[in-house]
Amino acid sequence: MIIARTVRELQEAKKELNGSIGFVPTMGALHQGHLSLIQQAKKENDHLIVSIFVNPTQFLEGEDLNAYPRREEADRKICEVAGVDIVFMPEIGQMYEKDELCIGAPAIRGYILEGEKRPGHFDGMLQVVMKLLNLSSATRAYFGKKDAQQLSLITQMVKNYFMDVQIIPCEIIRDEYGLALSSRNVYLNEEEKHRALALSRSLKRATKMVMQGELDVEAIKKEMMQVLSETDRVEYIAIVDRQFKALEKVQIGNTIILVAAWIGKPRLIDNIWI
């Protein structure tokens, strides 16, 4: 396994790769959710590149970039055991120049839900993902459905900019109790982990209602809010179609139900596709 810390080192390492390239971009602090992406990419491609880069431009004022969990040695071992060919671990100066051109999230889809609560977050995310996709020369890039709005925007970016890469959505990985895996879960104590299960329980409640014939969005949200009373603060419940347009009625096969809530220190998100 090659560790590339500069763009030049990555470009040199890629010269040894022949065939399809799978790419998994991460911010490190790898967990089983990341590993599932890596394993799928390994299975479906001749070669595999993983990036580990805590991107400063997607952190907002007041969000502590320096507090984001970093476990470089552990992450490297996970990648090595998983059979990754190249791990790209650049410093900030490798990824950004002063006064560079920027791309931005679309005015509507990029500034609702996560984009409304964290304005500018998706601008920074799309900027770095475009750079990483170009640098990796990926045939396929793998993203989890847990960040559903991010996945939607990346897919749109690739289409709008005619980028020659296939975006592969991957299922949400949960722990044995149903909590969606996240690097931010390390901030939860045992009591908070138990309360955090309210997110997945609220989504299960919504799914059960839909399966029983209840399609009214407001009725479903009301039931979900009751389940989410165990959280410290609910930031949003949203029921949208795959293009992130708000719905009045659930459309089977074209609906995403999303929730964001605070539990102790971290802000957690979860969703289900119906």
Swiss-Prot record:
Q: Name one GO molecular function term.
A: ATP binding
Q: What is its EC number?
A: 6.3.2.1
- Gene of this entry: panC
Q: Which GO terms describe its cellular component?
A: cytosol
UniProt function note: Catalyzes the condensation of pantoate with beta-alanine in an ATP-dependent reaction via a pantoyl-adenylate intermediate.
What family is this? Belongs to the pantothenate synthetase family.
Q: Does the keyword Nucleotide-binding apply?
A: yes
Annotated protein name in UniProt: Pantothenate synthetase
Q: What is the lineage of its organism?
A: Bacteria, Pseudomonadati, Campylobacterota, Epsilonproteobacteria, Campylobacterales
Q: Which GO terms describe its biological process?
A: pantothenate biosynthetic process
User: Other remarks on record?
Assistant: The reaction proceeds by a bi uni uni bi ping pong mechanism.
InterPro entries documented for this protein: Cyt_trans-like, Pantoate_ligase, Pantoate_ligase_C, Rossmann-like_a/b/a_fold
Binding residues for beta-alanine: 58
Question: How is this protein organized at the quaternary level?
Answer: Homodimer.
Tell me the keywords, alphabetical order: ATP-binding, Cytoplasm, Ligase, Nucleotide-binding, Pantothenate biosynthesis
- Which sites bind (R)-pantoate? 58, 150
Q: Where is the active site?
A: 34 (proton donor)
Q: Where in the cell is it found?
A: Cytoplasm
Positions with a binding annotation for ATP: 27-34, 144-147, 173, 181-184
Catalyses: (R)-pantoate + beta-alanine + ATP = (R)-pantothenate + AMP + diphosphate + H(+)
